[in-house]
Amino acid sequence: MTLNKLRKKYIDFFKSKKHFEIMGKSLVPENDPTVLFNTAGMQPLIPYLLGEVHPSGDMLVNVQKCLRTGDIDEVGDLSHLTFFEMLGNWSLGAYFKEYSVKCSFEFLTSSDYLNIPKDSLYVSVFEGDQEIPRDTETAKVWESLGISKDRIHYLSKDHNFWGPVGSKGPCGPDTEIYVDTGKSKCSLDCNITCSCGKYFEIWNNVFMQYNKDENGNYIELGRKCVDTGMGLERTIAFLQGKSSVYDTDAFMPIIKRIEYISGKIYGQKEDDDRCIRIISDHVKAACFILADSSVVFPSNLGQGYVLRRLIRRSIRYAKKLGIKSHFLADLVDSVEAIYRSFYNELTEKKDFIKKELSKEEEKFFKTLSQGEQEFIKITRNLPSKTIPGDIAFKLYDTYGFPYEVTEELAIEYGFNVDKLGFNEHFKKHQKTSKKGGDKVFKGGLADYTYETTKLHTATHLLHKALQLVLGDHVRQKGSNITAERLRFDFVHSEKMTDDEIKKVEEIVNLQIKNSLSVKKIIMELSEAREKGAMALFGEKYDDLVSVYEIDGFSLEVCGGPHVENTNELGTFKIQKEQSSSSGIRRIKAILIDE
């Protein structure tokens, strides 16, 4: 069984059970600013689990890319991952506990699918408490399928209950499925709650059975849902008889390439193995972030900071392996080869990924050299073994040293870091930057005069023209439009050439000359996205949105206002193209009446 075969078998099985396959979402949540990345398969489907009607029906199956940053420091052991895939099937009121459990059991044990002996399976169910009864219903289903009572464990809310999101809302018990790896028990008390590695949790079925109200009461839901998640990497490790996810075909091609570059052999020395695992995990995660439709570049903020940290941490551990030259781009082919049959974005953006990794690598080699020298100089004169917060912040602010790198260096040299002090200086820096930013840039339209409206329409033409000239990765990151000029921030990592600027101007002016009509259409957000309408990524939209179509050229979700025809605009001229921030360019342009 391979990674790709398992993914396909899962999808095919649930499609045979009348589930509709839906596409996985972007790594970056579209309408959830509270998290940087999708961390679970159910995250993009929360609105539908909470009651919205899904356009594809009430029985769904998908594969969701996920990325968890909370455990980055744990990556390097045998199990923790930054990027992973979650296989999921969903019932939005169509079926409940019995059918869900029976489907899971069939997929796991059928000779047509995973063919796992049922005697290798262990399960947990909710033990009940004063508010919610014991989940004997699910336990009885497992018993009816041949899972003996001694392999059914009743566990507390901490283990076997999901939700609600916040203080109230839908929630319910779950049942977790474990496999026995065949390892010896670590003690007489060893069971599925033990972390010794004998038992692997591979699947979780969540049963949305209750609604918790504002008074803390649990009320039975009329429409009960099922949300399940199977970890692809953990499951394939078990099926391939491996003790670690890194020993599977999800990682070995990357590890083999690291062996070739470094001259180290995986499996010979634990310190080297840890470095190799960190590099293979982080480079894979970085490739998927760079390939994502959300368009993320390395930076010091949000998703960009996570990407930068993954890249720079890879470089730090490569140095420990003795890799002194640039190497990141050399690993991209190995990542792409593993996933090309399912994630074509890695193939389409392979050259772009290599380019961005190499650029960040070049930046960090300079930063690392200067920063390490400064670190050694500073610590040589410290009166204690604690690096003060202001010095740690200086390394960050002056040399671009992420706090985590300072912390890792500190451990190497026998120091610790005043993290609270660093955070205080960092917050002061953020406040100062925000005040300055508020003065410099205020987004949107200054007013709704005719001149401002014309420039607003010109902005739509500019947005599309930039995509045609520079590539589909171009996305609006902000705009500021007055009666005199437009200012447009967009995702692009390089300074535009004179030839590119000229081509953009020519495309915009051709659309003006062609007298294209501008129409406002009201449609559902899902329909707008299906039609390819551009939208501000991360913006929250209503179910019904206004979409402005510039006759066959541009389609964009927008509140308006706009002119009725492009022939009203005059001549478009770019006055300036410059950097706005890391990975973001800014254009200032005007319209000339002729």
UniProtKB/Swiss-Prot annotation:
Cofactor remark from the record: Binds 1 zinc ion per subunit.
Any one GO CC term of this protein is: cytosol
Gene Ontology terms describing biological process: alanyl-tRNA aminoacylation
Q: Does the keyword Protein biosynthesis apply?
A: yes
Q: Which residues form a coiled coil?
A: none
The cross-references to Pfam families, in alphabetical order and at most eight, read: tRNA-synt_2c, tRNA_SAD
Q: Which cofactor does it need?
A: Zn(2+)
> Which cysteines does the record link by disulfide bonds?
none
InterPro entries (alphabetical): aa-tRNA-synth_II/BPL/LPL, Ala-tRNA-lgiase_IIc, Ala-tRNA-ligase_IIc_anticod-bd, Ala-tRNA-synth_IIc_core, Ala-tRNA-synth_IIc_N, Ala-tRNA_ligase, Ala_tRNA_ligase_euk/bac, Thr/Ala-tRNA-synth_IIc_edit
Q: Does the keyword Zinc apply?
A: yes
Which reaction equation describes what this protein catalyses? tRNA(Ala) + L-alanine + ATP = L-alanyl-tRNA(Ala) + AMP + diphosphate
As for subcellular location, the record says: Cytoplasm
Query: For Zn(2+), which residues are the binding ones?
Result: H456, H460, C558, H562
EC number from the UniProt entry: 6.1.1.7
Q: Which GO terms describe its molecular function?
A: alanine-tRNA ligase activity; aminoacyl-tRNA deacylase activity; ATP binding; tRNA binding; zinc ion binding
Keywords associated with the record: Aminoacyl-tRNA synthetase, ATP-binding, Cytoplasm, Ligase, Metal-binding, Nucleotide-binding, Protein biosynthesis, RNA-binding, tRNA-binding, Zinc
Major place of localization?
Answer: cytoplasm
Domain text: Consists of two domains; the N-terminal catalytic domain (in this organism this is shorter than usual) and the editing domain; the C-terminal C-Ala domain found in most orthologs is missing. The editing domain removes incorrectly charged amino acids.
Family note? Belongs to the class-II aminoacyl-tRNA synthetase family.
Primary role = Catalyzes the attachment of alanine to tRNA(Ala) in a two-step reaction: alanine is first activated by ATP to form Ala-AMP and then transferred to the acceptor end of tRNA(Ala). Also edits incorrectly charged Ser-tRNA(Ala) and Gly-tRNA(Ala) via its editing domain.
What name does UniProt use for this protein?
Alanine--tRNA ligase
Source species, please? Borreliella burgdorferi (strain ATCC 35210 / DSM 4680 / CIP 102532 / B31) (Borrelia burgdorferi)
